[in-house]
């Protein structure tokens, strides 16, 4: 996810130069607010780009509220009956679908990540001091401050 954010950031910054990004996330383990590398990369991104990041997680089993789930449904209908025989075919079909009258921005993110890499407990404690977990919903609402106006 951070790779995609880094890829899209120049376009986003040119359009509106935001000082806050709101990211709505599902509860998948790969983007958990307890994943050390995920939080580390988001903190680095926020600081390097002078932007605050507000992460809000959808509750478990509430995919009906998550717009990306509706996009997946449209994409599945769009490529129904197609043989997904290559990455190029999948990307091409994704680029030609329409959702709410718009074509999505589709890019292939290249990257291979080593498994089992995590921050030390001390490094994670240091990171925890740079983020704010909203009281009462600590797992589902996290603010990362990087904007220095």
Task: Put a short name on every predicted segment.
Residues 1-14:
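Active-site beta-loop-alpha junctions of metal-dependent nucleic acid enzymes
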Residues 15, 79-149:
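C-terminal accessory extensions appended to soluble enzyme cores
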């Amino acid at each position: 996810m951070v790779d995609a954010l880094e890829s899209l950031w120049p376009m986003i910054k040119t359009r509106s130069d935001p000082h806050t990004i709101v990211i709505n996330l599902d509860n998948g383990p790969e983007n958990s607010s307890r994943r050390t590398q995920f939080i580390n990369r988001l903190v680095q991104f926020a600081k390097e780009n002078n932007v605050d990041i507000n992460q809000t997680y959808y509750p478990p089993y509430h995919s009906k509220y998550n717009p990306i789930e509706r996009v997946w449904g449209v994409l599945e209908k769009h490529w129904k009956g197609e043989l997904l025989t290559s990455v190029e075919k999948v990307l091409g079909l994704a680029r030609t679908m329409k959702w709410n009258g718009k074509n999505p921005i589709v890019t292939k993110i290249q990257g291979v990540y080593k498994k089992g890499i995590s921050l030390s407990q001390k490094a994670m404690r240091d990171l925890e001091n740079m983020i704010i977990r909203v009281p009462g919903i600590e797992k589902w609402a996290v603010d990362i401050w990087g904007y220095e106006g």
